[in-house]
């Protein structure tokens, strides 16, 4: 089963705030038709555990599209082997450091009219296994219309396999391991802790 949210909104949509996004995630998790939670956890669900929204984690980034895109198999937590391309790169400054995140496109979703402009940013950082899920987190993205974009880590969320073992989740590539703490977005679920996989490239 697929393991990430498909709540994708335009980066430039200032009306859809970080708070609104988090409220939408809570609604998704509370709804039995869209929630990844097991029945027992769904019955007791009140809210996901978020870091306090912090504007320091809303950064301006420069998007560079990769013209020569090569397909590859992105490793997952199961034997599922989804095909992706590295669609582009985001360069930004956070906590005084110049950082980069690679942005990927699912080849399956790229032919779906509803999600053809959907991009995917799986990443790890120094909070994993401590305050956040050990397997990393995800950000949703859309193909931008311009090179200057906004990257909002307050919208970082856990893969569904952090909540339910029936899901198959992409493992963030090592090239998307950020050498900083991203104390924004969704925290780890309950006392769930999984060590980062540093062997995936």
Regions found by a protein language model. Give the residues of each.
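Acidic, glycine-rich flexible loop segments
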Residues: 120-157
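Extracellular/lumen-exposed scaffold segments
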Residues: 40-45, 50, 70-86, 102-103, ...
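A mature extracytoplasmic/lumenal domain signature
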Residues: 63, 103-107, 125-127, 153-157, ...
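Bacterial Sec-dependent N-terminal signal peptides
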Residues: 1-15
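Terminal leader/tail segments of proteins
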Residues: 55-57, 69-75, 144, 175, ...
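Start-of-domain marker
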Residues: 12-69
């Amino acid at each position: 089963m697929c393991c990430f949210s498909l709540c994708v909104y335009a980066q430039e949509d200032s009306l859809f705030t970080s708070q609104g996004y988090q409220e939408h995630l809570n609604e998704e998790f509370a709804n039995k038709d869209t929630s990844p939670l097991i029945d027992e956890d769904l019955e007791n669900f009140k809210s996901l555990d978020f870091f306090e929204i912090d504007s320091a984690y809303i950064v301006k980034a420069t998007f560079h599209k990769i013209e020569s895109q090569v397909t590859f198999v992105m490793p997952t937590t199961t034997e599922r082997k989804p095909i992706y391309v590295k669609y582009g790169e985001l360069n930004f400054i956070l906590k005084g450091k110049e950082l980069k995140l690679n942005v990927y496109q699912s080849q399956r979703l790229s032919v779906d009219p509803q999600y053809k402009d959907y991009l995917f940013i799986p990443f790890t950082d120094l909070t994993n296994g401590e305050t956040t899920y050990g397997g990393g987190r995800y950000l949703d993205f859309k193909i931008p219309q311009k090179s200057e974009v906004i990257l909002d880590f307050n919208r970082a969320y856990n893969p569904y396999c952090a909540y339910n073992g029936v899901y198959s989740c992409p493992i963030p590539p090592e090239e998307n391991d950020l050498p900083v703490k991203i104390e924004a977005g969704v925290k780890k679920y309950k006392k769930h802790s999984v060590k980062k996989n540093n062997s995936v490239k």
